[in-house]
Amino acid sequence: MNNITSPRTDDQGIEQEIQDKGLTAPRITPADIQANIANVFYFTAKQGAEMAAKEAGSNKAGEPSEGIALGLLTFCVLVLKNGFTVTGESACASPENFDAEIGRKIARENATQKIWPLMGYELKSKLKG
């Protein structure tokens, strides 16, 4: 059996491939993306619903069965250095598989992916001058 290593398609793997090929034109790097994140917030939809109910003067955040479903949806809010926000989410279909840490990782990655086009647009505008 052939052991063929497939190329990495994650952000760091792609950046390494760019460097290996000697490409040096201006670009956004994974480090640029991370450096642009000023703050990170995580919460579940259940926590959001409970806070919204509390602020509305109610102690009910929906039916108990909804609480289980809402607890499986994790949000990540990234505040960028300029104050702009991007969000990511992670939904778990099965309560038995829910893991808060994994949910936060997936939600953050999904939010981080939204920064690329924003910073790419900004770079292109600067290059166009």
Language-model segments: residues:
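Domain-level marker for long, solvent-exposed, non-transmembrane regions
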Residues: M1-G129
